[in-house]
């Protein structure tokens, strides 16, 4: 299915970008892309979003395996007839596996996209995080659209 190709693409781009950061940047260094807006910053995270559950790797291993199994099951069952859901789940699957690879092989997640939104210093994130968020937003959009169709 094409949705697995989307997941593989996310994993590849995520892992290549993280490898480039690890090989070419010292931890904590930052390269401005757009001053006061976007930076490439070498950062490591031993937890989840905003560093929560730091150093709880076994928790993340177990949760991720269960989550990935659920996503694959859901893709097989529902994505065949729903293109937007399939794309969303492919992005989520790729993001989950991308960060899982980091946790297994590095015991931390490599983050590097650093954004300031209206002077808010947003936590540093990566391609896998972005794919997860985009996938979730697409599922929310789909749910809203389906709710509107059901009312009509």
Swiss-Prot record:
Functional note: This protein specifically catalyzes the removal of signal peptides from prolipoproteins.
Pathway: Protein modification; lipoprotein biosynthesis (signal peptide cleavage)
Cellular compartments annotated: Cell membrane
Residue ranges of the TM segments: 55-75, 85-105, 124-144
Organism in which the protein naturally occurs: Bacillus mycoides (strain KBAB4) (Bacillus weihenstephanensis)
Main localisation: membrane
Protein name per UniProt: Lipoprotein signal peptidase
GO biological process terms held by the UniProt record: proteolysis
Pfam families listed in its UniProt record: Peptidase_A8 (PF01252)
Keywords: Aspartyl protease, Cell membrane, Hydrolase, Membrane, Protease, Transmembrane, Transmembrane helix
Membrane topology summary: Multi-pass membrane protein
Active site: 111, 129
GO molecular function, one term: aspartic-type endopeptidase activity
């Amino acid at each position: 299915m094409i949705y697995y190709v989307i997941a593989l693409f996310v994993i590849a781009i995520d892992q290549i970008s993280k490898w480039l950061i690890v090989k070419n940047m010292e931890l904590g260094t930052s390269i401005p892309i757009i001053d006061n807006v976007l930076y490439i910053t070498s950062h490591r995270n031993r937890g989840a979003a905003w560093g929560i559950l730091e150093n709880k790797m076994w928790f993340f291993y177990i949760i991720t395996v269960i989550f990935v199994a659920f996503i694959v099951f859901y893709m097989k069952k529902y994505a065949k007839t729903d293109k937007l859901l399939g794309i969303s789940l492919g992005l989520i699957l790729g993001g989950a596996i991308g960060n899982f690879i980091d946790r297994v092989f590095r015991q931390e997640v490599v983050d590097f996209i650093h954004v300031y939104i209206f002077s808010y210093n947003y936590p540093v994130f990566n391609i896998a995080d972005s794919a997860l968020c985009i996938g979730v937003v697409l599922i929310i959009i789909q749910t809203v659209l389906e709710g509107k169709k059901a009312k009509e």
